[in-house]
Regions:
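Non-heme Fe(II)/2-oxoglutarate
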Residues: 2-98
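Catalytic core of non-heme Fe(II) oxygenases with the double-stranded beta-helix
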Residues: 77, 81-219
Length: 219
């Protein structure tokens, strides 16, 4: 699903990685250390959010997931950082962009979640609450269901939180995309978005990149 004028917010980047590299990523992920988190949107920088409050929106499934952080807080957090960072070099070539600052790389493995139904999504959030302008790439490691959602609200640093846990009746999806191995969604990271839990597949695995590109850096 898309709406008019969405191109300046988000775009699907199909098959931008060679198949051999796609398979190498899948093989590497099998040997990673994974860490359980009880809600998929949270990470240490989310101290700006009231993460203790229950999610009031009935569309939100507060599912758990497994994560692996490759880069955060200005430095590599994993021995696999350079391997996963190389994914962005293919994106740079495909879209003719230049990444000048890395903000975060996080892998997320989401299994099925009891009670999760069609039309639901995980917590709406932005990944970074301390940077005025940045891009996000959600790379799909495997084919799955559990669409990526982008919503009609942009983060306002004067009015946090980075996670929306209140009932937001005016919050509507302006873009959704179904996970396809080797492809991804590239978008303005200031827009609230949400991952998802699979229903028909055993798992949904993505690599989430947040970064600044040259044009943004020069502003």
């Amino acid at each position: 699903m898309t709406t008019d004028n969405i191109d300046h917010i988000a775009q699907v980047v199909d098959d931008f990685l060679p198949l051999a590299f796609q398979l190498e990523i899948q093989k590497t992920i099998e040997s990673l250390p994974w860490y359980w988190v009880d809600t998929v949107a949270l990470f240490p920088a989310d101290r700006y959010a009231d993460s203790s409050a229950a999610f009031e929106d009935p569309r939100v499934s507060d599912a758990f997931a497994f994560t692996h952080i490759a880069f955060a807080e200005g430095r590599p957090q994993s021995q696999y950082y350079e391997f996963f960072r190389s994914i962005l070099r293919f994106l740079e070539a495909k879209l003719d962009i230049q990444v000048v600052e890395m903000l975060r790389i996080r892998l997320r493995l989401t299994p099925q979640y009891p009670g999760h139904k069609e039309g639901m999504f995980n917590a709406p959030h932005v990944d970074i609450g301390t940077v005025n302008s940045f891009k996000t790439l959600v790379y799909y490691v495997n084919d799955s269901d559990g669409d990526t959602y982008i919503f009609n609200r942009r983060y306002d640093s004067s009015n946090p939180p980075v996670i929306l846990n209140k009932n937001e009746p005016d919050l509507q999806a302006i873009f959704t995309n179904t996970p396809k191995q080797g492809s991804g969604v590239y978008f303005d990271g200031r827009y609230y978005h949400a991952g998802n839990s699979p229903i028909n597949y055993k798992s949904r695995c993505i690599i989430n990149f947040d970064f600044v590109i040259k044009e943004q850096h020069d502003l």
